[in-house]
Amino acid sequence: MSEIQVEVCFTDKLESVRVGGKPMEIPKAVKAKPVEEWFEPAAGRVKWGGLGAEIKEMDFGGEKDAAYSFLFNGPEDKKQEFMECVERFCLGEEAQQETKKKTVQDYLQEAKKNQQAGNAEMAFQQYMVAARDYGHPEAQFEVARCYQNGTGVEKSEENALVWYKKAAEQCDAEAQCALGECYYQARGVEKDDKEARRWYEAAATQGNVTAQYMTGRLYAELSYNVAAVKWYTKAAEQECPEAQYELGVCYEAGDGVGKDEAKAAELYRKAAVQGYAEAQNELGACYSNGTGVAKDLEQAFECYRKAAKQGNVKAQYNLGVCYAIGGGVTKDPVQAAEWSARAAEQGFAAAQYNLGYFYRNGEGVEKDPKKAAMWYEKAAEQGFAEAQYMLGYCYNIGVGVEKDTSKAVFWYRKAAEQGNAGAQYELGECYYYGNGIDENETEAVKWYQKAAEQGDTDAQFALGKCYYYGNGTEVNYETAARWIQKAAEQGNADAQNLLGDCYCYGYGVEPNNEESAKWYEKAANQGNTKAQYSLGRCYRNGTGKRKDLAEAVKWYEKAAEGGNADAQNSLGYCYEVGEGVTEDLAKAAKWYRESAENGNEVAQCNFGLCYEYGKGIKKDLAEAAVWYDESAEHGYARAQFKIGLFYDKGYGVAQNKEEAAKWYRKAADQGDADAQCNLGYCYKKGEGVTKDPVRAAELYRKSAEQGNATAQYNLGICYEYGNGVTLLKATAAEWYRKAADQGDSDAQYKLGVFYENGYGVTQDKEQAMQWYKKAAEQGNESAKNAIDGMQGGGLGTAVAAGAALGGAALLWKILRG
């Protein structure tokens, strides 16, 4: 006689009946009835002969006297009611006895057989009987797993938790470990790390390797590193690769155990041999950096490759780096981009940043600014500072995205707040120039300072300039020089040039021509045109360098060819006067023109002089006037005087005394002595201005005190005749002498008159004759006539007269002949 098992599944109603593994068709109306009514035939149109009858009608190979065993999955009270009904409705004492005789091991074995046969639902029901009716911990654990995975029953993490707890409370190590995971991963219950640690540690104490690893991990999360090491060690000794890896991390960092990089590398190796990708990657890092092992880039590459092929995102990133830089493998931009892309597509920010770099520069992929910006953005949104900085750059200049300076500021700030020095500098620039944000030099200085303190050379130089010029902070040359020097020492050419200026003029440092020239030379050798020009000046003037005009010209030429307007002007001067080169007026005019066209006001004036006097270019007063006017509009005093003179005389422009006076005044206000003299003349004569002798005398005095001979002569006239000043012959004589000493023939003649007649000086005809002669030698007709007059009237003794007459006659002949 064979045994046929009847399985009944009940929740709040009859769910199913399986007879010998075959499902029974049960009308819905029957399923909802009380237990006792299952055994009664249905009334009306429902086809149901009662559970007993339906069981017997199922075909099992013609067996007439089969014995039935019953398995009821459901609440205990319903089970009892069901078994009473089985007995009452005469399914057989033998069947009932068979059911009662089954042991928990029978259920467990049958459940496992059903599992192997793929009959998950039957396996679950058998595990449930053993778990519920017999309280068997293994069965409780299996029931929990079925609920957790939805195997043979509807998935329910809450029910899984209930059964894991039942088994765990009976000290089942696997259940304790699983229960710890439920609390750790918040499966069917709120996350509770403390409760998770309690159950993991209970299982760990029984030797469960997974629980030992997880106990160590939870202690590590609390920074209880000694306890973490203890449990990692226990799990590692059982060859748990995860624990070996984590223990290696502890040894490498010295967390909870003495630092031992060699031990760390060995633990990584053990885990790596087992194929643990995280350890393979970390072992690669050890070989890359020589941490605990001899540096070996080829070995590092192999470790990265193994981990990368398993999908380890860090290893894929590292493998991309190896291919990018040729680390342990032949440099291959295509492979670099490919592996970076694999990691990037998994969301690894550093790889996304690198992939953006590859697209930006066209390395290993076709250049694509839009894709570059896209990958930068993906990394930036994960908080990757370098990507935030580069995304800011993209928005700042409109590369791969539409230009948007406010977005640039947004991303620069994100990166800057994470300490990215480049972004801090750029944010400072945005504040300094009002780019994408309101201009704020004080805020600019703050960000420059942050970047400068991290060694960013551009920021160091920018900060130095702020202190140098007093932008956003008080002028402080000492602080300026300190920051400028830091940037200069890192090779920043602009900083080297400005440091040269500091040493040249003593800004923040002691003046030192040799140091100045040294820094100019460093910058000049990097192609800095300002420094090349300044170095040329050092050689021209012999300051900090031996005087060498040819060397000066060499550096002027380098700077001039680089477009430096000051150097172009100086080179023009060298060619004009033959200083360090052979005189060449055509080349002089050429370089003056280039400098003038670059906006150099001195060169504009010099180029005007070329046109005025036909130096190296055809004489053209109208063109001269154009360039004088251009220079004058730029505020160059000498050009203002020249254009004033042109308007005064009508050279190249229509004569206009008012315009002349206007330009004389502009130049005079800047202290130009010639302009002061001529403006004085305008006031004396009332040309272009209202006649004003007092103002005229004031201007003559300003010019005269600067040594202008014509003004000294004119001021002498003012004092001689009392024009605009009190008449003072002695003062007139003083100013005539100053002009006469500079070779002014009219002043020399006047001084002769004063000595001959004793005006403002003691009469002295010998002195008078000497000054007349000086004036006459320059062709002064009045002086010649005065000499003739004095010779006719006699002078001194006969000997003296003869000597004087002889000398005068000889001189006269030379001048008149």
Question: Where are the predicted features?
Answer:
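Short helix-capping/linker turns of helical repeat alpha-solenoids
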Residues: 102, 114, 133-136, 149-151, ...
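Short hydrophobic alpha-helical membrane-entry/anchor segments
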Residues: 791-797, 808-817
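Non-Sec secretion/translocation targeting segments of pathogen effectors
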Residues: 1-6, 24, 816-817
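TPR/TPR-like (Sel1-like) alpha-helical repeat modules
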Residues: 766-781
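Hydrophobic face of amphipathic alpha-helices that form TPR/SEL1-like repeat modules
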Residues: 106, 110-114, 130, 142-149, ...
